[in-house]
Amino acid sequence: SRRKATLGVLLGCVFTVSFMITLLVVSLKTVADDLNSTTGVISWAITAPMLAFGVVGPAFGKVGDLWGHKRVFVGGLFIAGVFAICTALAWDAPSMIIFRTLSAAGGSALGPAAMAYINRMFDPSERVRPLGYWSFVTAGAPVIGVVAGVPLVSIFGWRTIFLMQAPLCLIGCIVAWWLLGDTERRKNVKFDVQGALSLGIGSVLILLAINRGPAWGFISARTLSVALLGVVVLIYFVRVEKRASDPMLPLQWFRTRNVAFPVASQALTNFAYMGGFMIVPQLLEIGLGFSTSHIGWLIIARPLVFSLVAPFSGRIAMRFGERNAGVIGAIAVMFSMLLLSQVDAGASDLYIAFGLSLSGMGLGIASPALTALLANSVDVADLGVASAVQQLLNQMGAVLGAAVMVGVHEATISSGIVKSFSYALLAGAISSAIGIFAASAVRRTPRVL
């Protein structure tokens, strides 16, 4: 059917802007050596796009809601493809980081637009299943990228990553323009420029302070100044939105139970999920002396299980309800952190893989259900910006989790290397436990139209 074909195109295009993320992470040293730089500098090719991906999304989501998501989707994909070519041709570290960031900024348009299409195509009672497929793609793409891409990178070099991505993006533009239908355009509504700029600037300052906290020091003057400036800008954003006739982000959403609590639960579980992504490989390498290849095949268990569980999350949600699916998922992530916090020299590969798999299973169950609850609680005309705000807050939770859990490890390293990693993972367990309570606070409500 056309609906299935459209879903396939949306997910295929999302895959093209997602598959290289983990592959680039494992190739940082190769990139640094080729560009006569250091991994510390080249790591900004991960950090800067991550900031751009979360921050630019709300503006793209709002533009799509106002002027049509087809143009935003195809335009974002085109930008991602053009700057992927530029990244492949980068001549030094700054050019590579800039081009990669611009490519990610274009790719950030796809998430809100694709979610808006999915939520328009499927009735509220049907949304969990296609959102499960969405989670399958977003979790599975990095796995496929690593498995298929590492051999190519080792033979042909890191530029292969982007030489593969660019034609996929441009082909996706053609297919999407041909197949996707136009969404409705809202007349006599202005784009909230002040709101978009203040939300974007405030968010990037907060994310930057969180991300650089471990390097600068969480209580250093630089970190506190950046964070304080971010808070001031976000306060200004709230004042702008209260006065705006057509606000960028309806503030009343955060007083709606099925908007505030699903977003909070996802951010809290992403805190643990992303923090674990940073901590566990270090635990295995530095604490236990595992080889890089050994670690790679162990940590792949988490996104693999995520991608396998997500397509079935619809059945789980329909059987037990979205709230229970969110609670079950957060519980699984919490137990994952608790199990991994007990890893020591005597832990078996099976035990470690099981602990990692629980994290993947938890997010695979919870994310589609909580995303569907959010979509069912906002007006159809605001689905793009709602999805983008969810993307932004999830990103904030992930960045905060990575920074805080690394900070806990560094602050407690005097107690022993392995023990300090254990304390960091316990911080993730606490965050997930709070996420359980947030998920339990949601309820099924009629969709607000």
State where each predicted segment sits.
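Flexible interhelical linker loops that connect adjacent transmembrane helices
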Residues: S1-K4, S125, C173-G200, K242-R257, ...
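Helix-breaking motifs and short loop linkers at transmembrane-helix boundaries and internal kinks
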Residues: D34-N36, G68, L89-S95, D123, ...
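Cytoplasmic helix-loop-helix junction between adjacent transmembrane helices
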Residues: T101-F136
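Membrane-interface helix termini in secondary transporters
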Residues: T30, P58-K62, L66, P151, ...
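12-transmembrane solute porter fold
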Residues: R3-M20, L24-L28, T39-P49, F78, ...
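C-terminal membrane-cytosol helix-exit motif in multi-pass small-molecule transporters
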Residues: A166-R185, G200-R212, L229-A244, G435-R443
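Conserved MFS/SLC helix-loop-helix module at the cytosolic interface between two early adjacent transmembrane helices
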Residues: V55-P94
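Helix-loop-helix hairpin linking two adjacent transmembrane segments in secondary transporters
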Residues: W134-I174, F191-G200, I206-A227
